[in-house]
């Protein structure tokens, strides 16, 4: 080896080794201080990528576990609401069993139906208001997906179903609906009659509703004017009394001619503005048409102006063809051909009333015709029908009986087999509750599996990126010794050029 001064090879070699030991010492100290074997990609590029993927999975699965717990909470909230709906249904069933007992009076059935209605309304309220984090869980059919994995498509679906009165098949549930109307019901409705069978008189008023085509009850009101379809009496409704005035009789097709002729004669013999008395009622000639007795006369009853129109009447042997009462209020008018006219300020309709005897019995087959539709009641006591459809007796909130047709009764009709309907509703609720219970158990299983997976992934990631302290402490001790030795040797190496100077002495 040459003896040189400019280049100290031993010193350079020692410095290089000293730098290596310094780097090892720094790495060991960094790992020991961070607890990680991989602090940057340079420590282990592949290991860093693998550990990073594990981290993504671990974080995703941890959140998925929380999602599954939220799913359990949703199912529990929904199931709790269904439990309350079930309680209401059980009470409705209990009341329905009570209602089917024949010992109940009408008031008992009404009280039972009132509570049933309240219970059904509570079911709808629970359905509309139950929600989880702003999501209504029973108001509509919905599939709620719960993410229970770290990747796309890893979901569990909760089937939320609409549970309300309508979806349970209990819409219109009624244990106190209208009953089929019979002739007995029809006869009993014609009461408070004096002398004649009156189609519209007294406290219970029946009329034909042209709009719906159903016979309905009309409560006593001060703004109705009626004409007796059997005897021609004019009847005005008053809360305190009924005023009747005989105008003319219409029990036969030719009856009433004398009375009508008397009015026509008064018109013919007078002039417009003249007054005359007929059967204790003062009439005024409003309009006179020609000299044949045609025209209009009017009178006032209970403050209501009523006009009688006489047309096509011959003073001779001809029969009366038509006579119509008109008023600003609702008017029911009897005419000699057995028809009566409805004046409802918008249109006039006709209906035929026949074969109702004065003693309130039904003679043969009684028919009421409205716009071609015949209401038929057989004298044998059979039910009343309209065009083959059964009529029903219903009671309003005030207790007034109403005769309604089959279509109108459909919404009010007592529920057929009410207990079976309730059992069906309970079965549907039970099915939904069972589904929610099963989904809760499934979520529990998913949470357990997610926990196991997260634990295993954490262990795998730890083996890749966590520092082994035994190894790192050993590496640090080794590096420290090398540092000390290197520093000492470097001092010796730096003294080697001094030996060359001895050659110059």
Swiss-Prot record:
Keywords: Bacterial flagellum, Secreted. Gene3D superfamilies: 6.10.280.190, f41 fragment of flagellin, C-terminal domain (2.30.220.10), f41 fragment of flagellin, middle domain (2.170.280.10), f41 fragment of flagellin, N-terminal domain (1.20.1330.10), Flagellar export chaperone, C-terminal domain (6.10.10.10). The keyword Secreted applies. InterPro entries: Flagellin (IPR001492), Flagellin_C (IPR046358), Flagellin_C_sub2 (IPR042187), Flagellin_N (IPR001029). Pfam families: Flagellin_C, Flagellin_N, FliC-like_3rd. One of its GO terms (cellular component) is extracellular region. One of its GO terms (molecular function) is structural molecule activity. It is found in: Secreted; Bacterial flagellum. Flagellin is the subunit protein which polymerizes to form the filaments of bacterial flagella. PANTHER family: FLAGELLIN (PTHR42792:SF2). Belongs to the bacterial flagellin family. Individual Salmonella serotypes usually alternate between the production of 2 antigenic forms of flagella, termed phase 1 and phase 2, each specified by separate structural genes. This is Flagellin. It comes from Salmonella dublin. The gene is fliC.
């Amino acid at each position: 080896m040459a003896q040189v001064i400019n280049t100290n090879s031993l010193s350079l070699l020692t410095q290089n080794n000293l730098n290596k030991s310094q780097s090892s010492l720094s790495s060991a100290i960094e790992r020991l201080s961070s607890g990680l074997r991989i602090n940057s990609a340079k420590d282990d590029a592949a290991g860093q990528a693998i550990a990073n993927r594990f981290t993504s999975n671990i974080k995703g699965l941890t959140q998925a576990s929380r999602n599954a717990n939220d799913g359990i909470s949703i199912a529990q909230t929904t199931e709790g609401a269904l439990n309350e709906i079930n309680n209401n249904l059980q009470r409705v069933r209990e009341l329905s069993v009570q209602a089917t007992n024949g010992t109940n009076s009408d008031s008992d059935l009404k009280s039972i139906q009132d509570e049933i209605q309240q219970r059904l309304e509570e079911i709808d309220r629970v359905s509309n208001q139950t929600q989880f984090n702003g999501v209504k869980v029973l108001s509509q059919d919905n599939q709620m997906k719960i993410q229970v994995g770290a990747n796309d498509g890893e979901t569990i679906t909760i089937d939320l179903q609409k549970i309300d009165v309508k979806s349970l098949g209990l819409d219109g549930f009624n244990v106190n609906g209208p009953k089929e109307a019979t002739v007995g019901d029809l006869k009993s409705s014609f009461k408070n009659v004096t002398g004649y069978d009156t189609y519209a008189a007294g406290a219970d008023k029946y009329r034909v509703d042209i709009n719906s085509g159903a016979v309905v009850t009309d409560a006593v009101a001060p703004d109705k004017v009626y004409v007796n379809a059997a005897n021609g009496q004019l009847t005005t409704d008053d809360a305190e009394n009924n005023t009747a005035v005989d105008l003319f009789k219409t029990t036969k097709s030719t009856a009433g001619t004398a009375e009508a002729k008397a009015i026509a004669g008064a018109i013919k013999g007078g002039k417009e503005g003249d007054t005359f008395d007929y059967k204790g009622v003062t009439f005024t000639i409003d309009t006179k048409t020609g000299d044949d007795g045609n025209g209009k006369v009017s009178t006032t009853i209970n403050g209501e102006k009523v006009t009688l129109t006489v047309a096509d009447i011959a003073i001779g042997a001809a029969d009366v063809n038509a006579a119509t009462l008109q008023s600003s209020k609702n008017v029911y008018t009897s005419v000699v051909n057995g028809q009566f006219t409805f004046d409802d300020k918008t249109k006039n309709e006709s209906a035929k009333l026949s074969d109702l005897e004065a003693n309130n019995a039904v003679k043969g087959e009684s028919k009421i015709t409205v716009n071609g539709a015949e209401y038929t009641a057989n004298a044998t006591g059979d039910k009343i029908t309209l065009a083959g459809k059964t009529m029903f007796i219903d009671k309003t909130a005030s207790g007034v009986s109403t005769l309604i047709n089959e279509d109108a009764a459909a919404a009010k009709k007592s529920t057929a087999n009410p207990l079976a309907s309730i059992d069906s509703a309970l079965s549907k609720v039970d099915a939904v509750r069972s589904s929610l219970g099963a989904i809760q158990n499934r979520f529990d299983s998913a949470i357990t599996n997610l926990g196991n997976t997260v634990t295993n992934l954490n262990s795998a990631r730890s083996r890749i990126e966590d520092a082994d302290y035994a190894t790192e402490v050993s590496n640090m001790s080794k590096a420290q010794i090398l540092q000390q030795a290197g520093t000492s040797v470097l001092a010796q190496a730096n003294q080697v050029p001094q030996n060359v100077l001895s050659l110059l002495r």
